[in-house]
Swiss-Prot record:
GO molecular function: phosphorelay response regulator activity; protein-glutamate methylesterase activity; protein-glutamine glutaminase activity
SUPFAM superfamilies (UniProt xref): CheY-like, Methylesterase CheB, C-terminal domain
Localization terms from the record: Cytoplasm
Active site residues of this protein: 164, 190, 286
Description of post-translational modifications: Phosphorylated by CheA. Phosphorylation of the N-terminal regulatory domain activates the methylesterase activity.
Function: Involved in chemotaxis. Part of a chemotaxis signal transduction system that modulates chemotaxis in response to various stimuli. Catalyzes the demethylation of specific methylglutamate residues introduced into the chemoreceptors (methyl-accepting chemotaxis proteins or MCP) by CheR. Also mediates the irreversible deamidation of specific glutamine residues to glutamic acid.
Top-level class of the enzyme under EC nomenclature: hydrolase
Protein name from the UniProt record: Protein-glutamate methylesterase/protein-glutamine glutaminase
PROSITE patterns tied to this protein: CHEB (PS50122), RESPONSE_REGULATORY (PS50110)
The UniProt record lists the keyword Methyltransferase: no
CheB-type methylesterase domain sequence ranges: 152-344
Keywords: Chemotaxis, Cytoplasm, Hydrolase, Phosphoprotein
Organism: Salmonella typhi
Amino acid sequence: MSKIRVLSVDDSALMRQIMTEIINSHSDMEMVATAPDPLVARDLIKKFNPDVLTLDVEMPRMDGLDFLEKLMRLRPMPVVMVSSLTGKGSEVTLRALELGAIDFVTKPQLGIREGMLAYSEMIAEKVRTAARARIAAHKPMAAPTTLKAGPLLSSEKLIAIGASTGGTEAIRHVLQPLPLSSPAVIITQHMPPGFTRSFAERLNKLCQISVKEAEDGELVLPGHAYIAPGDKHMELARSGANYQIKIHDGPPVNRHRPSVDVLFHSVAKHAGRNAVGVILTGMGNDGAAGMLAMYQAGAWTIAQNEASCVVFGMPREAINMGGVSEVVDLSQVSQQMLAKISAGQAIRI
């Protein structure tokens, strides 16, 4: 099998050296070239035709976003962004994902060499995932039309969503059409700390429903969406007649914190047939067992189809485990989940 050919673009000579060490330390990939800025990278892309590009967000001559926008328009290819762990860095990274980047890695704030080398396996996994990703599925999406509100729903009704690679844009596509009368939506998206708050704030500006980073102990309200905070598990709990959010520091599940399985298992336990579960694009199997538990508890469960996924890992695993009621294109997910929950069809006969 041929190696994954990687090109790294970063204005830091140290970062270029570190990325080269990381990539070349894995037998299934190789660094074919590095570039100090996008203008040099443009020529190297033509020369080496890499499978994956790693791209620094902030660079001289042309910043990473401008370059990414041109690249995805003229020569679409898998891109993994390299971002700083700052408020501004998270906003720029989310914009990069919107423009078509597959994923991102964050630079440690201290001890760059030691920190990046510690991330070696994670970086390699993201590069492998990017090399297999569907670029055509990751074109920026137009804002969808708002769906018509169904009948007033009981506060018992609930939608739970899980996603990973490619999920930020998929979640946006699912939430934007939801009317204010929608049931509560609770979401686990694999993301590091700091990024989930920026992600929630970005969605809140784009959606009719309110979107926020979830907080421990808050009540779950209709017309609101709650994003699990980075590096924390989120679970659904009961507080009398109401649903409540629990945030905790439990060990990683399926190597993830937050974990979709943790959320889905809690929804199966506390919401049962009053819930609709949705599993979107993502690598790995997180959420598959939890979705089966939701299905067995009477929930209607939806998996995104392969054609519209950036990475069809998590939905495939959920389908293979037998916990999926229906498989639909991303463009139909919002409509289907509202139709099922509004018609009371979260309950399977």
